[in-house]
Amino acid sequence: MTQNYVYIETFGCQMNVNDSERILTMLADIGYVPTQEPARARLILLNTCSVRAGAEEKVYRRLENLVVLKRHNSRLIIGVGGCVAQQEGEALLERIPKLDLVFGTHNLHLLNDMVLAAERGERKSETSFIDNDQRLDLFPPIRGTARISSFVTVMQGCENYCSYCIVPYVRGPEVSRRSGDILREVRQLADQGVREVALLGQNVNSYGLKSSAEPSFAELIRLVAAVDGIRRIRFFTSHPKDMSPELIACFGDLPALCSQLHLPAQSGSDNVLARMGRGYTREEYLEKVRALRAVRPDIVFTGDMIVGFPGETEEEFQETLSLMEEVRYIDLFSFAYSPRPGTRAAELADDLSRGEKQSRLERLQALQKRTTMEINDVLLGTRQTVLVEREGKRPGQISGKADNGRTVNFSGDRSLIGTFVDLRIIQVFQNSLLGELLPG
């Protein structure tokens, strides 16, 4: 079999990162090995995100740069997958004549055949939905991982249809993977040296809700925690309305379940939440936060916020700031609203100026920056157990993550990668911590 090189760029969420890892596993079966150099590749793939307009345009600009490589390599194949591919379909081939293949979010299992067809000079687009659990059986597990932590997809799709969000339209309805397949993959990862798994889904805590044959998400976490070798569990992304009492109890009962939770609020205003179609009120969200802190006092929250949603008043924006002050997120992904064609919110009057949206975003981010540093300051001098994951950016340093998700850099030998070490935090920064090894 001839060996070719494949270069993948991944945009967007952890689900896309996991999909890209699986794509590399699949392509190995037809002789492709990964490279970090686009100019070296026979095959270049972009795994794309369309959640926000900025991400979508970034993909188009990147494609325009990459097709230039075809001037020097007539054999080069360029493909686009992910949510932009699902949304645009064959229109991508029409917009970019030098593009060779387009594959949607349900069609990864067809990619090898599409690549082989492209090698023969055929241009292909496949974005048809598979509307049942067959789509989760068609995608192979990752093989040969050398990572210490790994993503594990447990469900796909979303049926919340928040008014601003394109995801249900490009990812399709919710489908839960069989728990036996999930546990088999987790055991394989543990046997390969993985010590931390992150369970993934567009709305991960709705796992099993549509199937009486599968455990609930809380029960699934308990099953994963029982796998020998797995010492840490995280999950992304959860919806506040599906944060059940049973799932909250897991944070008090399972030491392996990390003390970091991504719990997107999107707004602190009941009026805005209703227009967004989020399915909960401000107080219901805060009740979940208080319940989680009651069972896990050291828990920290990350989240998402949208400012400038249609109709948002200054008073409603202030309610978002006050929610942030009460929750005290350790990190926050924040964005100015941009309408997505095909969503319900796109039909609302986008009545805030770009300048006002930007002003609110800057005020929100300034508050978050202060809060992050205040939380980090409290960690100064504390003892933290860190899973060492990689070499650091500075010579002689290695890097890992604490239970709370903070990146910690420290001086140490690379032989520590893959182990848990105890560190004392000696310096804090906005996005990372500096530690020193404790004897033990």
Swiss-Prot record:
UniProt binding sites for [4Fe-4S] cluster 1: C13, C49, C83
InterPro entries: Elp3/MiaA/NifB-like_rSAM, Methylthiotransferase, Methylthiotransferase_CS, Methylthiotransferase_N, Methylthiotransferase_N_sf, MiaB_methiolase, rSAM, rSAM_horseshoe
Keyword presence, Mitochondrion: no
Keywords in alphabetical order: 4Fe-4S, Cytoplasm, Iron, Iron-sulfur, Metal-binding, S-adenosyl-L-methionine, Transferase, tRNA processing
Record: residues binding [4Fe-4S] cluster 2: C158, C162, C165
SMART domains cross-referenced by the UniProt entry: Elp3 (SM00729)
NCBIfam families the record matches: miaB-methiolase (TIGR01574), MiaB/RimO family radical SAM methylthiotransferase (TIGR00089)
Oligomeric form and interacting partners: Monomer.
UniProt-recorded name of the protein: tRNA-2-methylthio-N(6)-dimethylallyladenosine synthase
Phylogenetic classification of the source organism: Bacteria, Pseudomonadati, Thermodesulfobacteriota, Desulfuromonadia, Desulfuromonadales
